[in-house]
Swiss-Prot record:
Keyword Cell membrane (UniProt): yes
Annotated disulfide bonds: none
Pfam families linked: Linocin_M18 (PF04454)
The protein's name in its UniProt record: Type 1 encapsulin shell protein
Main location: other
Signal peptide: none
Function of the protein: Shell component of a type 1 encapsulin nanocompartment. Assembles into proteinaceous shells 23-24 nm in diameter with 2-2.5 nm thick walls. Cargo protein DyP is targeted to the interior via its C-terminal extension; probably only 1 DyP hexamer is incorporated into each shell. Probably involved in protection against oxidative damage.
Family: Belongs to the encapsulin family. Family 1 subfamily.
Keyword Signal: no
Domain of life: Bacteria
One annotated Gene Ontology cellular component of this protein: encapsulin nanocompartment
């Protein structure tokens, strides 16, 4: 048994399999950051912080001594509780293939959004500087006319190249922007196809972000450091329900300020 306490949950092996499957595919469907940043191997439940390799000057304890603290980024634990019906759980053992796992999917979606918001927008309470605030490139404004968006993306890629940032490059679009470029056409083709021809990388639907980002995916510029990857744990149960949660521990580091260009709506 580990500190997820799953062995104590009144959930059959078959039901656990379905719960994990729904959580995994919903999380992967909505998360975007992991597709464009480096993701570390999980450090394990005992991991509490990640070294930045830097030193912080502190007051010396006595004359003739120089003191420094090793700078580090603490890992934040993100937990999303959800409740499942025991009736729905037991239906799996009775052969049902349509148990209601909506609470699992809602929790997975919420966790994916929180992770992406931390990566791109930052999370000050957890000492995370997001890509937007860490970028040294001037943000570019997204035009109201979707037909002009490819020109702005081309400008962003040019800025990356002028800053000495090699490709490949990827473009992340918020849900609203992605819809606009998918539904608007020019010369008979969706704007999304025009963008695809411009970008030597992926065009990614990123529903958690605001606006858009153009960034390099060459590696070594952005680092999602995990303590424990997304896991499902058990809290309690009663005669009718089981209380579970999705959880991960992480921090995020930006190593290269010029490696991304934010696009603002």
């Amino acid at each position: 048994m580990n500190n997820l306490y799953r062995d104590l949950a009144p959930v059959t092996e078959a039901a656990w399999g379905e719960i994990e499957l729904e959580a995994s595919r919903t999380f992967k469907r909505h998360v975007a950051g992991r597709r464009v940043v480096d993701v570390s191997e999980p450090g394990g439940p005992a991991a509490a912080a990640v070294s930045t390799g830097r030193l912080i000057d502190v007051e010396a304890p006595t004359n003739g001594v120089v003191a420094h603290l090793r700078a580090s980024k603490p890992l934040v634990r993100l937990r999303v509780p959800f409740t499942l019906s025991r009736y729905e759980i037991d239906n799996v053992e009775r052969g049902a293939n349509d148990s209601d796992w909506d609470p699992v999917k809602e929790a997975a979606k919420k966790l994916a959004f929180v992770e992406d918001r931390a990566i791109f927008e930052g999370y000050a309470a957890a000492s995370i500087d997001g890509i937007r605030s860490a970028s040294s490139n001037k943000p570019l404004a997204l035009p109201a006319d979707p037909r002009e968006i490819p020109d702005v993306i081309t400008q962003a890629i040019s800025e990356l190249r002028l800053a000495g940032v090699d490709g490949p490059y990827s473009v992340l679009l918020s849900a609203d922007v992605y819809t606009k470029v998918s539904e608007t056409t020019e010369h008979g083709y969706p704007i999304l196809e025009h963008i695809d021809r411009l970008v030597p990388g992926d065009i990614i639907w990123a529903p958690a972000i605001d606006g858009a980002f153009v960034l390099t995916t060459r590696g070594g510029d952005f680092d999602l450091q995990l303590g424990t990857d997304v896991s499902i744990g058990y809290t309690s149960h009663d005669a009718d329900t089981v209380q579970l949660y999705l959880q991960e521990t992480l921090t995020f580091l930006c190593y290269t300020a010029e490696a991304a260009v934010p696009l603002t709506s």
